[in-house]
Amino acid sequence: MRGLAAGWNAEAQHHYHLACGELARSTLADAGARRPPAVFAEAFGLLAGQLDRQTRGDADAMLRIIDSTPIPLGKLCDWAKSNGRFRGLKMHVVFNPGRALPRVLDITDANVNDARVGRAGAVEAGATHVFDKGYCHYGWWRAIDAAGSFFVTRPKTNMGLAVARARPLGERAGEGFVVLADEEVRFASKGDSKLPIALRRVTIERDDGRQIALLTNDLARSAVEVGALYKARWQIELLFRWLKQHLKIRRFLGNNDNAIRLQLYAAMIAYALLRLAARANAVKLPFLRFVDLVATCLFERRKIGAIEKPPPVNPTRASQKTSPDQLGFCYA
């Protein structure tokens, strides 16, 4: 935190246009402890909504991948709760892989069930929601189906399913997998757990020989398309890895719950701003390179669309190739 304050204060000539002054370490510490994370969460929601409106016309804009990523915390965060695997927090995200657009559902303790957070989010009509077996909640599945939306997930091992009808197999080969079976199923039990919606089970075999059963309420897509939708879920794992590597959310500036949540939301706000800037200025660079250049040129006046190019030389100022006080070398 002292290094952050020192680096900021070293750029004092740029503070005027930001309406800021010098920064003290105690100011950062107080803000981390007292500033409400809800303000940052709302700001990120507005930015993500703006990105969503810009990409609404895309063909793949209606695919939503839902997952959570662990945020392990050290021994100094003795307030953090454990779920048996790690102690810390979890960040729950809805991800549109077509335009790399994430939305933060919530940041919770590690012991909060994923399904509890997933069903609290709004269901988008016509969207396809892809998630793993941790989001198993029949009431939420009914709400998705009632909204005219679809889900693709994996059934739990203790979920009793009976085959109602075998569907004919058309194309079987997908990218990295082969379809083994396509069946319409129903719950074997007749208790409260029975779902009053049509279900379909698609069994696929990956190239490594592992077999995976998928459960969906989508009866229109082909079995290969259903398998490809679930395979796309791994794109959110790549997003989590990218965020942790490049947005400074492995180490935190504070040890209290409030400060850590603020830093997580601030990182997501930075991600959304960078995506908006790259899209608005038609940046052709790879996104990671663009992020690195923005960090390098943060306190310089540069055109975002040409951030990789050196600034133009002032034509009104005569340039000197040498200075009279410059040391010269004379070769005999």
Question: Predicted regions: what is each one?
Answer:
Residues 1-58, 62, 72:
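Gly/serine-rich nucleotide phosphate-binding loop at the start of the catalytic core
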